[in-house]
Design a protein with these regions (language model features):
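FIC/Doc superfamily catalytic core
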Residues: 1-185, 189-352
Length: 352
């Protein structure tokens, strides 16, 4: 179901609209801060981000929360494009951006630390009044390092993973980070940021958690933790993703009107006929973004058979557009020359 909706979303060209990447980023920021109590809307953030105009009736902390998270996302997107290894130091640097103007200094028996600098907590915290305590602060550095190692190991295998498996990996990253709770504040924003950073790296549509889903979102996290069952959070996130995609598709169709009919076998245009992106162009675009993708992974992303992909790869190689570096197993592709429509392939890249 999720993969079908993504195919329809991209076939309709929703992510090819002017300034789509910018506005999707603004939406991610707005909804993430709304979960934490911000009342700033997407339109208000557009004014704040694009024009630097202070918002009447909104306190400075709210505005700083949104401005800081936007800056953190921009840095995370850079890391995603560069396929940087995920490390404790990287997460601390991102947390410092998230909490730059709203963090504070803490004084403890073990020493002082600052959430504004992204420093790991030196005190224990609970999930609200009467809630269960998160892991002891002394275990945080080790558990955070283990999480980074696990994510890097699974990222290395991403080229062979299905879309559903990739989303599950990003949902798991979110859950594990918020469960470790490395910081005194900003853990929720950081967990959603890490999830979205991975989704952007994998060429997925980043997941949004809307304010109206906050209660169910928190329940899913708590229940997953209590029952030690990741499938609970995975199922919740998949359902939220499906609902949001369906709503965006319906809103797009109702506002545009003249849109293509999307079928399992492809896209059929009724009135206007935009130039259809060829499979070979999609393959080249995907290889430019990730040169280690296998034929199976390419087939799944494009929606054709692996055998068809292999034929396209052979033709592209013969035409001198791509070449193979190293052996079939362990090697990678290099894009030599391309003048087709690769830049129009529907891969979510939030920042240009």
């Amino acid at each position: 179901m999720l993969e079908t909706l993504i195919t329809k979303y991209r076939a309709l060209g929703i992510d090819k609209q002017i300034d789509y990447d910018k506005f999707y980023l603004y939406s991610l920021v707005t909804h993430s801060t709304a979960i934490e109590g911000s009342t700033i809307t997407e339109l208000e953030n557009q004014i704040l981000f694009d024009h630097g105009i202070s918002l009447k009736g909104k306190n400075l902390d709210e505005q700083h929360m949104n401005l800081d998270l936007k800056q953190a996302y921009e840095k995370a997107i850079e890391y995603a494009k560069q396929h940087k290894p995920i490390t404790t130091e990287m997460l601390i640097s991102l947390a410092a951006l998230v909490m730059k103007n709203t963090g504070k200094e803490y004084q403890t028996m073990l020493g002082d630390f600052s959430s504004a600098r992204g420093e790991l907590r030196l005190l224990n915290v609970t999930a609200g009044v009467g809630g269960r305590s998160y892991m002891n602060y002394s275990k945080v550095p080790m558990k955070l390092a283990e999480l980074c190692d696990m994510l890097n190991e699974r990222r290395a295998k991403s080229a062979t993973m299905s879309v559903d498996e990739l989303y599950q990996l990003t949902f798991d990253a979110h859950y594990h980070l918020v469960t470790i709770h490395p910081w005194a504040d900003g853990n929720g924003r950081m967990a959603r940021l890490l999830m979205n950073m991975l989704q952007i790296e994998f060429g997925l549509i980043p997941a949004k958690i809307l304010k109206e889903d906050k209660e169910e979102y928190i329940k899913a996290l708590v229940t997953t933790r209590e029952e030690d069952n990741l499938d609970i959070f995975r199922t919740f996130m998949s359902a939220v993703m499906q609902k949001n995609l369906q709503n965006e598709i319906e809103n797009y169709i109702s506002s545009v009107g003249d849109v293509p009919e999307v079928h399992d076998e492809g896209v059929e245009y009724q009135k206007s006929k935009p130039k259809k992106i060829k499979s070979k162009d999609k393959i080249v675009a995907l290889l430019k973004d990730n040169n280690k993708l296998s034929a199976v992974a390419l087939a799944e992303r494009i929606g054709i058979s692996a055998k068809a992909v292999e034929k396209h790869l052979s033709n592209l190689k013969a035409d001198g557009i791509i070449k193979r570096i190293g052996p079939d197993k362990g090697g990678h592709w290099e894009v030599v020359e391309f003048t087709g429509m690769a830049n129009t392939i529907p891969i979510v890249k939030i920042m240009e």
